[in-house]
């Protein structure tokens, strides 16, 4: 008998249906009657299982993008790391996504076991070893290098340029046109004075320190993972939370800033995670250190839960400024357990951090040096395209007095920022999923070592205008390390301007 089957609809893996004993056969294939949404259908009998765990049949996968291996499927604890191009065995999974794909696979590889995100895995070795080259993306980056010498920051050719899905949280929209103030941890007791300026002048985002050397409040994560840092807490937790609540109640987007690898307190508690070098006596946790990764991500997650931030901003996501000298000295130990290049470590950390923070319903932004607008991987491991492609917002720091002392670049902020922004805008176009470009601007009298130019509202406006003139329209954050109330009073009218 010919049943004249025709396809009606497809169901994703993991869909729950009611099956009946009735089966029919066509073209040597058995079909079982099912009910779904009060309608009867026939499906290939081989596609039905009684236990949802049996719906995942794959036994082998291949690593397309180097992956962090987690101890379990629930938290941020790191078990190991597996590089691109490796075959791994699938031994289980956590949950199925709405589209039927697996969220995390339970895997094994030699003596490594744990969980990895399925989005970084593919079905064949050919796919795993390929580089993303749609619109010649990989070709754009693969041969880039600093002219004249090797910086030892890594090769652009070893970095990942596959599109990274950027979430949009319905109850927490990403700030895409920021007019942002920066507040250090010492300002918490004066929050009302800053909010008065903010509310009256169109400030729509505020960056507040969580950790910059000292902690802004008494973190339980730090108490466990870095007691030395815990002892530095500057504010009462309730006072700090009250300040963040006031920011959000004012309709202002709250960004929590964490200085990541430049952390002497964590370094004192964990010297095993720090770079050791005769070329430097700095106590600097290595960007290769998974212990430092986990500490900062757990600190960020705690801040989201306890304080209610909309976004976490990571600063100092890099190796030290003197990483070049450390590298060429030949007597430095960067604690490079997994044989990564510096830029690979930075990018791999950001994959890890973004995955963890997106689970919490918040965004990740990262600060980078102004130098990163160039067409090369820096000595300290930052490469704009490899970072912007992953994070939700990228905040470069092209301060006008940071372009050398031979020319007074600070006296004409529009020209200086305009020249810089051309490179940054070009970098944004070289990747499939660029971040929002939200730029730090100079909001202090310059140059910093001997101020001679007053940076008033017009100087702020000049910088912002240059950004928008070059298509960097994600907004700005004013950098004033002391968070001077007097300076904010002086420049407040610049926030009220329309730059779009």
Question: Which residues does each PLM region occupy?
Answer:
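SH3/SH3-like (including bacterial SH3b) beta-barrel domains
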Residues: 2-13, 71-84
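SH3/SH3-like beta-barrel superfamily modules
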Residues: 10-44, 83-119
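Boundary regions of SH3-family modules and the immediately adjacent low-complexity/disordered segments
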Residues: 35-62, 108-168
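Catalytic domains of carbohydrate-active enzymes, especially glycoside hydrolases
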Residues: 191-216, 306-311, 393, 467-475
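Substrate-binding cleft of secreted/luminal carbohydrate-active enzymes
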Residues: 391-407, 413-418, 423, 427-500
């Amino acid at each position: 008998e010919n049943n004249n089957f025709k396809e009606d609809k497809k169901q994703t893996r993991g869909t729950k249906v009611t099956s009946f004993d009735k089966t029919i056969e066509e073209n040597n294939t058995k079909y079982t009657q099912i009910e779904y949404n009060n309608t009867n259908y026939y499906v290939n009998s081989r596609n039905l299982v009684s236990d949802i765990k049996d719906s995942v049949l794959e036994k082998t996968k291949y690593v397309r993008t180097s992956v962090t291996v987690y101890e379990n499927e629930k938290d941020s604890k790191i078990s190991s790391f597996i590089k691109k191009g490796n075959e791994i065995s699938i031994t289980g999974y956590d949950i199925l996504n709405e589209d039927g794909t697996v969220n995390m696979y339970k895997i094994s590889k030699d003596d490594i076991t744990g969980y990895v995100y399925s989005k970084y895995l593919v079905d064949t070795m050919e796919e795993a070893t390929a580089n993303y080259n749609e619109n010649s993306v990989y070709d754009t980056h693969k041969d880039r290098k600093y002219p004249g010498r090797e910086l030892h920051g890594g090769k652009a050719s070893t970095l990942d340029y596959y599109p990274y899905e950027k979430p949009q949280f319905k109850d927490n929209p990403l700030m895409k046109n920021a007019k942002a103030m920066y507040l250090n941890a010492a300002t918490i007791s004066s929050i009302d004075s800053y909010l008065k300026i903010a509310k009256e002048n169109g400030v729509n985002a505020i960056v507040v320190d969580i950790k910059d050397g000292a902690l802004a409040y008494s973190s339980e994560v730090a108490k466990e993972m870095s007691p030395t840092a815990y002892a530095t807490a500057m504010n009462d937790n309730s006072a700090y939370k009250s300040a963040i609540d006031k920011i959000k109640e004012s309709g202002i987007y709250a960004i929590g800033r964490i200085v990541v690898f430049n952390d002497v307190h964590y370094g004192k508690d964990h010297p095993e995670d720090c770079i050791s070098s005769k070329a430097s006596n700095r106590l600097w946790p290595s960007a290769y250190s998974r212990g430092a990764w986990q500490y900062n991500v757990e600190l960020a997650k705690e801040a989201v839960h306890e304080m209610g931030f909309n976004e976490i901003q990571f600063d100092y996501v890099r190796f030290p400024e003197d990483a070049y000298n450390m590298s060429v000295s030949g007597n430095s130990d960067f604690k490079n357990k997994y044989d990564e290049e510096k830029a690979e470590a930075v990018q791999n950390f950001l994959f890890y951090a973004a995955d963890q923070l997106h689970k919490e319903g918040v965004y990740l932004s990262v600060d980078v040096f102004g130098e990163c607008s160039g067409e090369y991987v820096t000595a300290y491991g930052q490469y704009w395209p490899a970072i912007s492609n992953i994070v939700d917002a990228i905040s470069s720091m092209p301060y006008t007095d940071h372009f050398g002392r031979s020319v007074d670049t600070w006296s004409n902020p529009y020209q200086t920022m305009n020249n810089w922004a051309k490179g940054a805008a070009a970098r944004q176009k070289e990747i499939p999923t660029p971040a929002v470009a939200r730029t730090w601007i100079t909001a202090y009298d310059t140059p910093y070592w001997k101020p001679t130019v007053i940076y008033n509202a017009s100087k702020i406006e000049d910088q912002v205008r240059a950004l928008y003139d070059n298509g960097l329209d994600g907004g700005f954050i004013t950098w004033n390390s002391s968070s001077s109330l007097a300076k904010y009073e002086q420049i407040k009218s610049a926030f009220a301007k329309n730059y779009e």
